[in-house]
């Protein structure tokens, strides 16, 4: 019975070590891949001393805006347009 428990413990330790190795390998692969701007939103935080170009669009200081791929989210309004890799997207700001 002790032998069976010892073998089970050794098996569990070996499986855990293998799982950690796989996890590290996956993290390395994810780190090596370049981020795809087309699949991500770009957040913009407007400070008081920033350029007045966004203020001209009605965006006030302290507002968080994002360059969205498609439509603005329900609690956002379109404040203008932005570019990601040359493509024009809506600039959405929280209300």
From Swiss-Prot:
Question: Which segments are removed on maturation as propeptide?
Answer: 20-62
The record, for InterPro entries, names: Alpha-defensin (IPR016327), Alpha-defensin_C (IPR006081), Alpha-defensin_N (IPR002366), Beta/alpha-defensin_C (IPR006080)
Record's GO cellular component terms: extracellular matrix; extracellular space
Alphabetized UniProt keyword annotations: Antibiotic, Antimicrobial, Antiviral defense, Defensin, Disulfide bond, Fungicide, Secreted, Signal
Which GO terms fall under biological process for this protein? antibacterial humoral response; antimicrobial humoral immune response mediated by antimicrobial peptide; cellular response to lipopolysaccharide; defense response to fungus; defense response to Gram-negative bacterium; defense response to Gram-positive bacterium; defense response to virus; disruption of plasma membrane integrity in another organism
Subcellular location field: Secreted
Signal peptide feature range: 1-19
Q: Which SUPFAM superfamilies match?
A: Defensin-like
Asked if the keyword rRNA-binding belongs to this entry, the reply reads: no
Sorted alphabetically, which PROSITE patterns does this protein's record hold? DEFENSIN
Q: Is this entry keyworded Disulfide bond?
A: yes
What are the disulphide bonds in this sequence? 65-93, 67-82, 72-92
UniProt-listed Pfam families: Defensin_1, Defensin_propep
Q: What is its main location?
A: secreted
Q: Which family does it belong to?
A: Belongs to the alpha-defensin family.
Instruction: State the protein's purpose.
Output: Host-defense peptide that has antimicrobial activity. Inhibits corticotropin (ACTH)-stimulated corticosterone production (in vitro).
Designated name of the protein: Defensin alpha 4
Q: Tell me the classification of the organism that encodes this protein.
A: Eukaryota, Metazoa, Chordata, Craniata, Vertebrata
